[in-house]
Amino acid sequence: MAQLNDNYLKLKAGYLFPEIGRRVKAFSQANPEAKIIRLGIGDVTQPLAPAVLKAFHDGVDDLANKDKFMGYGPEQGYEFLIDTLIEKAYKPLGVELKTSEIFISDGSKCDCANILDIFALDNKVAICDPVYPVYNDTNVMVGRTGEADDKGYYEGLTYLACTEENGFTPAIPKEKVDIIYLCYPNNPTGTVATKEVLKAWVDYALANDAVIFFDAAYEAFITEPGIPHSIYEIEGANRCAIEFRSFSKTAGFTGVRCALTVVPEELLAATGNGEKVSLNKLWNRRQSTKFNGVSYPVQKAAAAVYSDEGWAQIKETIDYYMENARLIREGLQEAGLTVYGGVNAPYIWLKTPNGMSSWDFFDKLLSECHVVGTPGSGFGPSGEGFYRLSAFGDRENVLTAIDRIKKNLA
């Protein structure tokens, strides 16, 4: 009989969002008249920007024209998109990148998982807690961990507590680790890292020959000046960091699928015998073998995101979501709740009232307010007692949801 990958059996029962879906489905079936408002999974609700949609259509039309038809594209992405990203997304930050250092993909979630293909299993990995579950679960899947303990911590991983007491900013680990996951603006807490904080991580990584996986999926939602949008704004990061970015939330591409990963040519890792090897070359080899590239029309649409017209339209949508975040944040505060985030990120991280558990609060909001959010404990043990709400809803639904919460909890 064929044998399976036993590591999958170590995973905690049910990925967070499917479990939310299961509970919501059960409640809906029992209460068919309830109008449920979903502020849980961070999916967007506003349509693609007109300039992006036009470029998307143009890309499809090109495929109907024999002279412009495109078949297989480069696995790394078309240069017209990569060059646009270099000029419009990175140069304004003072970051200089080469065409060979940007890889276009169909999602940051995939890249955050697939990047593990080029790293040895005996690397010591540090993950923030609470955290986007994909970081944790994919390390379990590849066999880097033992079993989970009663709290949900997996043997073999180093967890960096992000708590109310430390402002949800983890301390630099005292021991040596090889790979560090950082996400800023942070999902789920909505916090950001200053240049001083990121410099401390870069200095640690350089001193310990570690690699930082920097998830910048929400950088476009930063509203305050002086907050870094890229790890490469920090001197030396090109020698110790891989950056992941996504068009999903920035441009409403959750159903379109496009992202990018930056692997600098200066970034090296060691072989078993100590030889230094370029991670850029290894990632290129991995992508060329396992990935066929993002479709041409999608990349045409992605390039239009950074046109003057496209970015102006997208900025309006981002502002719409961040106004939702303000309304949620202030509404929850009026209800007497302690709230974090929602200023530089589209997520609000609230403290559950009266010491209630995260899942009990989920059930309370669902049954009493018909509002769905995300239990903080689903992001890790340190998320227990907290709850995440997303600002990606329609304005009317956001206002209705907050009104319901205020009436039931105030």
Swiss-Prot record:
MF GO annotations: L,L-diaminopimelate aminotransferase activity; pyridoxal phosphate binding
Pathway assigned in UniProt: Amino-acid biosynthesis; L-lysine biosynthesis via DAP pathway; LL-2,6-diaminopimelate from (S)-tetrahydrodipicolinate (aminotransferase route): step 1/1
Reaction catalyzed: (2S,6S)-2,6-diaminopimelate + 2-oxoglutarate = (S)-2,3,4,5-tetrahydrodipicolinate + L-glutamate + H2O + H(+)
A single BP term in Gene Ontology: lysine biosynthetic process via diaminopimelate
InterPro entries reported for this sequence: Aminotransferase_I/II_large (IPR004839), DapL/ALD1 (IPR019942), PyrdxlP-dep_Trfase (IPR015424), PyrdxlP-dep_Trfase_major (IPR015421), PyrdxlP-dep_Trfase_small (IPR015422)
Enzyme nomenclature, EC number: 2.6.1.83
Binding site for substrate: 15, 42, 109, 132, 187, 292, 388
Alphabetical UniProt keywords: Aminotransferase, Pyridoxal phosphate, Transferase
SUPFAM superfamilies: PLP-dependent transferases
Residue numbers of N6-(pyridoxal phosphate)lysine PTMs: 249
Binding, pyridoxal 5'-phosphate: 72, 108-109, 132, 187, 218, 246-248, 257, 292
Disulfide-bond pairs as recorded: none
Cofactor annotation: pyridoxal 5'-phosphate
Pfam families per record: Aminotran_1_2
Function comment: Involved in the synthesis of meso-diaminopimelate (m-DAP or DL-DAP), required for both lysine and peptidoglycan biosynthesis. Catalyzes the direct conversion of tetrahydrodipicolinate to LL-diaminopimelate.
Known partners and oligomeric status: Homodimer.
Protein name: LL-diaminopimelate aminotransferase
Organism for this UniProt entry: Syntrophotalea carbinolica (strain DSM 2380 / NBRC 103641 / GraBd1)
Classification lineage: Bacteria, Pseudomonadati, Thermodesulfobacteriota, Desulfuromonadia, Desulfuromonadales
